[in-house]
UniProtKB/Swiss-Prot annotation:
The keyword Lipid biosynthesis applies. It comes from Solidesulfovibrio magneticus (strain ATCC 700980 / DSM 13731 / RS-1). It is found in: Cell inner membrane. GO terms for molecular function: acyl-phosphate glycerol-3-phosphate acyltransferase activity. It catalyses: an acyl phosphate + sn-glycerol 3-phosphate = a 1-acyl-sn-glycero-3-phosphate + phosphate. This is Glycerol-3-phosphate acyltransferase. Pathway: Lipid metabolism; phospholipid metabolism. The keyword Lipid metabolism applies. The gene is plsY. GO terms for biological process: phospholipid biosynthetic process. Catalyzes the transfer of an acyl group from acyl-phosphate (acyl-PO(4)) to glycerol-3-phosphate (G3P) to form lysophosphatidic acid (LPA). This enzyme utilizes acyl-phosphate as fatty acyl donor, but not acyl-CoA or acyl-ACP. Belongs to the PlsY family. One of its GO terms (cellular component) is plasma membrane. Its EC number is 2.3.1.275. NCBIfam families: glycerol-3-phosphate 1-O-acyltransferase PlsY.
Length: 199
């Protein structure tokens, strides 16, 4: 009973649309109606500025980190910790508060694995940032992170999180299917161009 309640609370925390609230309160902009129409940190940053984008990133990351740390303090059950990890990300991606819609889950995924597998998480973030800097595309870095996480968990541990990392990575890739299509067609937006316009 307690485990079920915790999973529901984890989903609800993951589902809370911090990006929407930050954009509406900070700039009066609904990110669902502009830019990529996504409530995540990248779109909020493009629409509302870097500071509000970073705030959204931190809050979305916390949605994954806090439940996993709390779960680890409660139990060492690999199955339960894996379920908490997936619940947080699924909540962010398919929010009950947004009628089943949501973000792409990258920040929340990072938070989840910082709490459950910090070394693979940090290495995945490093690879993600490197790909973004080289390619100029945030989506390319996000996709790389989604692929790297289960591989690094399998290599460096904890191995019990590999299935959760694979499920979450697959969901992140699925959420980026439009970005993948734009990358293939050469129509994806580059953060370098966004910075040049802002300058």
């Amino acid at each position: 009973m307690a485990a079920t309640a915790f999973l529901v609370l984890t989903y609800l925390l993951g589902a809370f649309p911090f990006g929407l609230v930050v954009a509406l309160v900070g700039r009066g902009i609904d990110p669902r109606l502009a830019g990529s129409r996504n409530t995540g940190a990248t779109n909020v940053s493009r629409l509302c500025g870097t500071k509000l984008g970073v705030l959204t990133l931190v809050l979305d990351l916390a949605k994954g980190l806090v439940p996993v740390l709390c779960a680890r303090a409660m139990t060492d059950s690999p199955v339960f910790l894996s379920m908490v990890a997936v619940a947080a990300v699924v909540g962010h991606m398919y929010s009950v508060f947004l009628y089943g819609k949501g973000g792409k889950g990258v920040a929340t995924t990072i938070g989840v694995f910082l709490g459950g597998a910090p070394i693979p998480a940090l290495l995945s973030v490093a690879v993600c940032v490197a790909v973004i800097r080289v390619s100029g595309y945030v989506s390319a870095g996000s996709l790389t992170l989604a692929v790297a996480l289960p591989i690094l968990c399998a290599w460096l541990g904890p191995v019990f999180l590999v299935p959760a990392a694979a499920i979450i990575g697959g969901l992140v890739i699925h959420k980026h299917r439009d970005n993948i299509a734009r990358l293939r067609s050469g129509q994806e937006k580059s953060w370098r161009k966004d910075r040049a316009k802002a300058a």
